[in-house]
Amino acid sequence: GQVDITVTPDKETQAQLALRIPGWTPKATVTVNGEEVQGVTTGQYLVIDRKWKAGDKVSLAVDMPARIVRLEQFVAYERGPVVLARDSRFNDGFVDEVIMPASTQNGTPTLTPATPMPGTWMTFTTPVIHGTYSDRQCDIIQMHLCDFASAGNQWDEKTRYRVWLPLLYEPMYKGGTAINGYW
């Protein structure tokens, strides 16, 4: 994501601009009028002290990685600062069914942008192991997620949504270690 700020003082002014660099991003870049600013640290403020004139442009570019947050036998998905939810309007399964995230690299989930459903701002698909225990291999499906702010906004009793998704119980799970290629 990127945020652009245009400075518009009435006259050239010496001042400090403090930008909060989000802690959830692994990488952030700040430029002033196209020149990169050094000393950018995630999770802290970056103070730019200079003479500002009308039209100066400050840009903050951040990576917005997908993340999985685990709590006991539940997981939640996030992308940058946005919490995602499973919404029954996608008709891709019961929102309370157990899943197991399928990971790609170092436990990072794959979130693929999908065509937004009417009434949603962001929509993604992600591969998950679907189903309950059996003697056969469980299927991997593409589960839909949307931004939490849009989840369930139909205001009817039929629509259900969920942020904390129940996990397929994995007795071999040890502190986030991937097992057989799955998280």
Enumerate the language-model features and the residues they cover.
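C-terminal beta-rich recognition modules with glycine/proline-rich loops and embedded aromatic residues
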Residues: 1-6, 41, 61-183
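Short, well-structured beta-strand segments within conserved domains
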Residues: 3, 15-19, 53-62
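Extracellular and analogous surface-interaction loops
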Residues: 5-13
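Surface-exposed loops/turns
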Residues: 11, 42, 53-54
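Beta-strand-rich binding/interaction modules
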Residues: 12-32
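Solvent-exposed beta-strand/loop surfaces of large extracellular or lumenal domains
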Residues: 25-50, 68-72
